[in-house]
Each structure stands twice: as C-alpha cells, then as structure tokens.
C-alpha cells in the first residue's frame, strides 16, 4: 500500500500540465554534446555512481530503462543513516538528497553517456534546490562519485557544458564523494512503473504523468541507441 506521506506531498500539484512538464525537463540553447572526457576502457564488469536530480521516481525510471544498467535503486545520499527516512528527509533538514544508485556495465554504457542522459532529460541542472513542483535541498542536483575517475569525468563535463552555454542559466550541480547510500523504502522502488500499471492504485498518477512520464519518453526519443532492449 502506498504510504500516506507521499500521497499528501505529491497530490498537491502547484502548476498545470504544461507548466509541470516545462519545469521538469531542461530547456537548452542547443542540443547537448557528448562528453569530451570519459572514463578510460577498463576490465571492470560493474561500476556504481549515485545521481540526485529531483524526485527519485523519475530518475530511477529513466536509468532503469538504460542499456548496460543492471540496477537503479531509489534512496538517500548526503546525510546520515539515523534519519534516512522519507518522512524526515522530506523536511529538507537532514542533508540528504533523493538519489538513485546506478550499477552499470562500463563495457555497454559509459559514465559519460549516463551523465549526458542525466543532464539532457532527467532534470534541469540550473534549478537550485528544486525540480519542477518540488522544492527543498533534498531535490538538489548532485553527482556522488565512487572513484576519482568519475569525479574527473563529471567535473570535466560540467565545465564543457558551462563553456558551451547550452543552458539559459548557470549549472548548479554539485560533485561530491559518496559517503553512504541508503536504500529508500520499498514503496518508492519502481514507482513510475507501478503507477503506470496502477499497481497498487496510484494516488500520485497525475504527478507521475506530468513530471516523470515525459522524461522517460524524452529519453527514448533522444537516445534510442541507449534504450535497454532497443525500445
């Protein structure tokens, strides 16, 4: 059963359909270039990075559909274990960011490609401590790296995009080492898929339809070669 805390929070949409979609998907001055700097080829079979970019429902849905991603888990990063609970994190006072832990095969999809998706369709990196209708530090834009090479790639891509002025405003995305990741409650996992299937009855379908479904559609349209299963 969907937890009442998210029903209260998500159902109160403050903007209409057009405004919600516009606020949730980045607006560019030009299409995003591929990263000039990416990870070097390695023999690792799996790698993990944690990305924060607003409500984790849509972030998880997009990366779960990406080729080479074996796992996309909604959770919390940037705070302590003691208060890594949705009701507390939602106050915006714990230091956590709603995040998604992405485990991927670098031989199938590179970190640079994942970051291009992240900046293109997952969120608007020019919005400070908010995304669309959601406001608070828990919705901030942040990349939590697990290796120094990931840090190098992330910082280089942010600089590349900033220098190219592809966004109308400055990029506010933070880059920080991952200290810990705390898996979110089960009712948050695969939320968009469950909501689309109405399993269980989705009290937040309007929110998902306005804010998350367009991101997934945009990903499939812009990056068909990176869609899992080619569709």
Summary of predicted features, one role per range:
Residues 19-25:
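Hydrophobic core
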Residues 7-8, 12-17:
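N-terminal export leaders
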Residues 2-3, 14, 25-231:
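Flexible coil/turn and secondary-structure edge motifs
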